[in-house]
Amino acid sequence: MKILINIILVLIGNYAFASKLLIPMDQSQSNHLKAYGVAFWVLENDLEIKWLLNYRGGSFMLPNAKEIESECVIRGVSYEIIADAQAIAIESEILS
């Protein structure tokens, strides 16, 4: 029982500190064309977006906003919510 509670707390903790949304463009992406459409929608709405050319097929990193997450769900685009530490690690991996 304690193990289950610890797992739940870790998962909740990771979500609580999440500040970035990652749209992967590798084989895990369910719809590449619609993912580009989400990126274009984000740009049209004057929101920040980073194109990670050398990471997972040219993934996109965006701020974790409910509007963007909803747009991904509506369009059927795969996405991941990542924490600040993960975002920094990804950016440093690309730079090296």
Residue ranges and their predicted role:
Residues 16:
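Non-catalytic, low-structured ubiquitin/UBL-interacting segments
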Residues 3-13:
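Sec-dependent N-terminal signal peptides
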Residues 19-96:
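Intrinsic-disorder/low-complexity accessory segments
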